[in-house]
Amino acid sequence: MAYLENRDPILGQRILKEYPDAVFRDDLMFFLAKDAVLRGKKEEAGRLLMELNPRNLKEEYREEYLNLWRELNLDPKAGFLKSPVLFRGFIQYIELSPEEALTASEELFRRRYYREVVALLEGLDFQKVCFMLGTSLRALRESEKALQTFQECRDSRARAELAVMYYELEQREKTEELLSSIVDRNLVSDILFRLGRLNVQRGNFQEAINFFLRMEPSYRRDFNLGLSYYALGDYAKAFEHFLASVKYSQTRDEASTGNFWAYKCAILLRREDASEYLVKASNGAGFYHAVASSMLGLPVASRALRVVMEDESLPKTAGVVKAIWEAGFPEYARLEAFKRLRDLTSSDVIAISRLDPHLAVRLAVRKYGYGSFVYNAVAFPRPFRGKVEKASEKYSIESALIYAVMRQESLFDPYAVSVANARGLMQLIDSTAQYVARREGIRIRNIYDPETNITLGAAYLRYLLDQWKGDLVRTLASYNAGPTRVRSWPQHEDQYLFIETIPIRETRDYVKRVMYNYYVYSELLR
């Protein structure tokens, strides 16, 4: 960017005027504001800060933008309305209309800033906000306040939360009273499912069965009935319900799951047709499709790699994106690619994948859809190959496993930052990164540096594998949820049963997705 070379404010203003839709507009306005402050022109700086959209700023500039806003004593409410997350520390100093408070609280709720949500909602129309308020209080472990909030809330979702809370407090009669008072059968099934899963996670499988049997017929009802009977050793009933789950399945993933578990039961029942269910599982999608395919010696990885549609032209947009990237502005390159989405060809997506695999996957999904030929062509790249192999050799971790975790954690985005403030390719939170760095004698200069992040992630995987004596499933669960939490769960010897009874859905899904990635990369890296 020419302005960055000489900091000429006249040039900067001319660029803003001539390129009103430029992807770097807000960043440029921020630089102009900083320079205006240095020149003593605080009014001009304030105008620029008020005009720009902080949501479009690069992550590294946002905290400085906030501090500059404070330094210039700009309107705290205006800042908060621009970005409730960034300006959440201003809540106590501002007055908002009910509509403004509700809109801001919804954004903060999605980002899990529950304390700020409570502060915003407590003065609003109770019945409009009671479910979000109660849920936030519960997340903050303020159980008594959450219970009282749900008791007074007329939102049907609150009744579901209340039924579960009563059950957890061992007030079973109140749970049953609520269930009998609800007319909506779908809501009743949702509550029964949650109560059943709660018992599955506690290892109370007979109690779980009692709840699942009261549900309306569905995939989740019969799959979890099958799971519970399987855990109790009643493989005949489990087999029956797993087959029923296939009947009610609505996705190829669900069908594979039901068929794989039916296969497990059929083996234990010594059925001659057991292998048929394994074959059916391999014809679906998802984690159990990968497991079944591997067991049958079939390929898991898609063979639609590097597919280019014959009727599409050579890449054009990719050239523009590459030029911006190579000029040192990867964030702007990504923004420019999405601006040009309509003109994007499959050739562009594949060309971009060599430069920025994260961007290529996102573009493929947005333009062509998940599972499309173009998506399959870029879905499992092998970037940072030398750095991955170096970490693999140093810590005796398969490259396939490092790639599998990296894909799920950041989708190969070196600049990724999660809601929990995990950073970089391997998504390490600060405390974990510092612990591993001290343990391994690694100096962290930049946590976003690909080599540093990959090395720390591989070292942490090695540490967890050693803790779990090579148990990959529990290692992955620990990478996501923490080893202390994983140790508190029922430790079923059957690895698949352990996965399906993980109490946290996010972790359960995480383990399956990383394992699926692992199967794919194990093939691609042979």
Residue spans for each PLM region:
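Short solvent-exposed coil/turn linkers within tandem alpha-helical repeat scaffolds
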Residues: 17-27, 51-65, 85-96, 123-129, ...
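Structural motif corresponding to the intra-repeat A-B loop/turn of tetratricopeptide repeats
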Residues: 6, 39, 111, 140, ...
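Catalytic glycan-binding domains that act on GlcNAc-containing polysaccharides
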Residues: 116, 145-148, 169-172, 176-198, ...
